[in-house]
């Protein structure tokens, strides 16, 4: 029972870290990143479709994303979708491919993005602490039902606290890396 609680907690904490990585990859730094356009939706014959399903997205260099549509007729729709996204990007069509240069971030925009990054990091920490609280409540419930002793509960709670500390330090590392990325010019 105790091992199940620990394993469940660890699995949930890992998912929190994965979600944090996913959220961080969507926040634009000055560097080109193909995953930046993942959430851009294109009007594909009347239905909104993710850009990654109608085009190949690659980075041609550190400051340019190259979007190659699978259908030539989609070039205009893709360009419009990128322009209308909230990313502040200006795509340029070059024949059948679309080049998306990454404009350098202004100091003001960097500070805004750092606030967003810190908020996301705090959400990750809160989520991990909530998982710890749930695990501790499950342990207390087992003690009430006399399924485990108080000593077992204490040992399990300490193990869960170690897990919590490890994953919170991982959140801090992800946060520090993203802040460093944002401050690079």
Curated annotation (Swiss-Prot):
Example of a GO cellular component annotation carried by this entry: cytosol
Location of this chain's protein in the cell: Cytoplasm
Keyword Transferase in annotation: no
GO terms under biological process: cytoplasmic translational termination
Record-linked InterPro entries: Ribosome_recyc_fac, Ribosome_recyc_fac_dom, RRF_sf
Keywords tagged on the record: Cytoplasm, Protein biosynthesis
Keyword Aminoacyl-tRNA synthetase carried by entry: no
Major place of residence: cytoplasm
Top-level taxon in the UniProt lineage: Bacteria
Pfam families, alphabetized: RRF
GO MF term set: ribosomal large subunit binding
Purpose: Responsible for the release of ribosomes from messenger RNA at the termination of protein biosynthesis. May increase the efficiency of translation by recycling ribosomes from one round of translation to another.
HAMAP family: RRF
PANTHER family, A to Z: MITOCHONDRIAL RIBOSOME RECYCLING FACTOR PSEUDO 1 (PTHR20982:SF3), RIBOSOME RECYCLING FACTOR (PTHR20982)
Family, per entry: Belongs to the RRF family.
Protein name per the record: Ribosome-recycling factor
Source organism (scientific name): Legionella pneumophila (strain Paris)
């Amino acid at each position: 029972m105790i091992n199940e609680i620990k394993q469940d907690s660890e699995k949930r904490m890992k998912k929190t870290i994965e979600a944090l990585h996913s959220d961080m990859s969507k926040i634009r730094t000055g560097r080109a990143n193909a995953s930046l356009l993942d959430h851009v939706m294109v009007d594909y014959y009347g239905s909104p479709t993710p850009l990654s399903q109608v085009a190949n997205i690659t980075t041609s260099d550190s400051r340019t994303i190259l979007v190659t549509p699978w259908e030539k007729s989609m070039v205009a729709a893709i360009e419009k979708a990128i322009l209308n996204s909230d990313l502040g990007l200006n795509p340029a069509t070059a024949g059948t491919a679309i080049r998306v240069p990454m404009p350098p971030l202004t100091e003001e925009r960097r500070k805004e993005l750092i606030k967003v990054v810190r908020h996301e990091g705090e959400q990750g920490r809160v989520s991990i602490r909530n998982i710890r609280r749930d695990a501790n409540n499950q342990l207390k419930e087992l003690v009430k039902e006399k399924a485990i002793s108080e000593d077992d509960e204490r040992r399990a709670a300490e193990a869960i606290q170690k897990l919590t500390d490890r994953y919170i330090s991982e959140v801090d590392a992800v946060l520090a890396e993203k802040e460093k990325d944002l401050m690079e010019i």
